[in-house]
């Protein structure tokens, strides 16, 4: 096989595990493929050749090129040097073989250089001519004529014809060289211009700004912006679907009303579509990302994500105007009332005031955990540091460490961008305070980055340096490691209690001692595992210690059925699955250990003191004035000075000014401003801001419901759903309204209920320009505009159905994921959303039996009669009370409901809209038709008798007009009987005459299907006006007066 085929066979052998060989491959060929594949490796679908480097133990991976066109292009690129020069064969081979490889690469390089005309000319000029014959050929002379010039031509001719020389091939007369250059004018030429794209965009943008060739007008906040449909549809799928649905592709100009869009967030996207440059204020980044997600502009979303990742990876904090500083408070936080912040030592030797939300506190700038020398001596001045080039660099990449030195205890606080690790001794935990910064700090107790460490490797991140330096520094502290273990053991004993198991307590002590619990919850554990391999896990080391002490470790109980690896890492109580056994052990401590820490202000309980402390901070934020005053009095009573207070660090968002307790919280908070949703579902692609929301969403895709109720048959996907369901059985609910005290089984019900107590805005600020609806929020208006524009942006990925509203799309998508739909026990209808099922049960009319099963009957308090429909109940109550608001204008009979009046009017007009499909007999109402079909056509009785929409509208209009005309003719006949010889003059407008003619036309020509509502209302209003005795003087002068004979009108009917 050829080299390309052999390479493809090797690539197939390395990638295709099911069929590594092509069909029909012989056994000897398979052996060769296996042997050759040992020198190759596949990276990202590309085949690489591993070549051993000389005098080294490493291998160089060279990409194998399979395409002949690409091989020639690579040889050409390696052969051509800078400035148009040509490399030699050795140089070309050297440059090319550094990265690429294929069989016969050297031969192809030689062949290419032989075909290169410029290299051949250079070779011909530089080659020395050593042979005489070559010289004669170059000069155009013959060999014989040069040596024997005295011989005549005859002798030459005889010499050439002699038999001795006849056997030798006669040399042709040398001819001077002629180079023939053939220019092929056929073929396809492909060249690309890198400036063409920008030039076209620039021209389109200029046309947009000068309103040239614009075919769409965008209305945003009352202002018009011209644009091109092709540019908008190329950048946004939203506009493309909009123009296709509305038929605006073929029309000359279209006007798009973008109500609900904000001009500040839309104009940057419009500029990006024409300039490919996205420029916006960082404060409005969230609005831009939300709008780009609505318009399906994926490139803008990628830019927003890259900006956020840059801020995450390089530890950037973006501020509009200002610099980042690492500050630490040296005053006790218990004194926090009033005043402005004291001056801060700046780099220029001046003092600046830093406004904070903590009140009066002295701010000291720390660089790598050391105080400036000028401040130690009592002066304020500059503090140069060789490690920090600028303030921004120190805030972005350096690690601020604050350390205290006391004769009794040591405390180290480590602050990084990704996490905040706090290592405290037992005395500090009991007192819940952190010692103040001592003015004289020794260099041994401070973790700082020295020039030697920085010189070892600049690519090491700050997290890795801090994580590796923690155990080294712990050994350098004056207090030995064994004493620290004893102190931690004493605190662990007080935390766990005497009844806890020894194994768990020891495991907990060790994890807290080494900071594993903090790393586990901060996401650092995986990084530490990747960086350095631990020979023994924490469980193995604890087991070894227990065996050495003569104690036997208790083996966890395992079921005989669960022998798989997955079952060994599954919690038996809650069903959670863990990848590591250590995580399962730590998780089981939550179930088996009692919640000893109770909040004195509320009823919540916690397992750890740190959780209780974090919970109490939330209470102190609500009662800040009272707590500060009580803390100040207790501080004076105890005699402690403000210098020995606890150092509190708060992180302030530069955009909204919100204060956050941790740097991690600030990072999560910044997601709201950037609009980036980093957590995406791999199944449906939905994105979330928080990882917890992604986990809850992923549980919806799971078909298995592992949490089952013990009291009933129901099962649930999440544990929270099971707990909410258990509140129905127990009657106890933790979701209580703080305003009215109403309890709810679910948190969603409480959140919906709480909106009733919140004051709604008096004015709906977002109005629809197409209809009269208005909305409180812009997103509701945007979704509402989808119906007017005909856009259906929400598409189902399973069946490609599209919807305008997100709730309709979500209800449809659940039909694919939900295995067991909600089914009505009466009519059998299936619903994939519980809200729709409840609405159906509440409002659907299943007949009397169905309503009785659902306990929705209404009983009359006076006679005890039961009703299944609300309108029947209301009509019955009107009969008891004597209220009959619906009166017939012909005979004056009043009815309790409009349905009875409509049926009665048909007796005057003679209209019978309900026709039997078998015998074609017509009836006034559906009930009479049902009686007829039950008596004579029992096999053809339908479930429900309804008129079609057009037919029903026609009959309703005909009933109104006929009723009005009958009233008119009856009044005319009465006046005729009173005065038969007189003609009555009736004031009729021209429009009314047209309506009456239309009525007559419908009676003469039954093919006419419907009437206009305006004509009907004109006739009805005219008749009512005649009944009420409207005077002629009140009629406007514009009304045309026509004399009409009553006999003529009656004759027309």
UniProtKB/Swiss-Prot annotation:
The keyword Plastid is assigned to this record: no
Disulfide topology: none
Region (Disordered): 141-173, 546-566, 619-643
PROSITE patterns referenced in this protein's UniProt entry, alphabetically: BTB, ZINC_FINGER_C2H2_1, ZINC_FINGER_C2H2_2
Protein's recorded name: Zinc finger and BTB domain-containing protein 11
Biased composition (Acidic residues): 141-156
GO BP annotation list: regulation of DNA-templated transcription
BTB domain sequence ranges: 214-282
